[in-house]
């Protein structure tokens, strides 16, 4: 499957905009947050594809079906993320950007996933 799935991304953003008011969120805020999640995911996917090209093969691991398993899980996660974003916004500190930077700096993991987290939270404190 290609990494870039413009129609799917547009459908997700439209669904998030529609669901946002039910969570007490501005549709533009929710759309920006989910846009960042999508872009972070693509950043990691493109990097992994590049690594696999260099290695000559993807890891020999079982792959989950995108249509039947992965996307339904992601759809369920949308509601949870909207709820968490609304909760975050209600308690957001004025020092959000600094606290976020500190939290990201303390995260474990490889450089690629740290970069993905930075991208995913790019507008979180706006």
What are these regions (language model features)?
Residues 10, 14, 35-38, 42, ...:
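Generic structural signal for well-ordered, non-transmembrane alpha-helical segments
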Residues 85-126:
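Glycine-rich, aromatic-bearing surface loops/beta-hairpins
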Residues 22-60:
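Mid-length scaffold segments of soluble, non-membrane domains
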Residues 23, 41-44, 81, 88, ...:
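Short secondary-structure junctions and interdomain/linker hinges
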Residues 6-13, 17, 53, 57, ...:
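Alpha-helical context
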Residues 15-24, 46-50, 65-69, 105-116:
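Short, charged low-complexity intrinsically disordered segments located at boundaries
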Residues 49-90:
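Extended amphipathic alpha-helical interaction segments
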Residues 1-36:
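N-terminal Sec/ER secretory leader and immediately downstream segment
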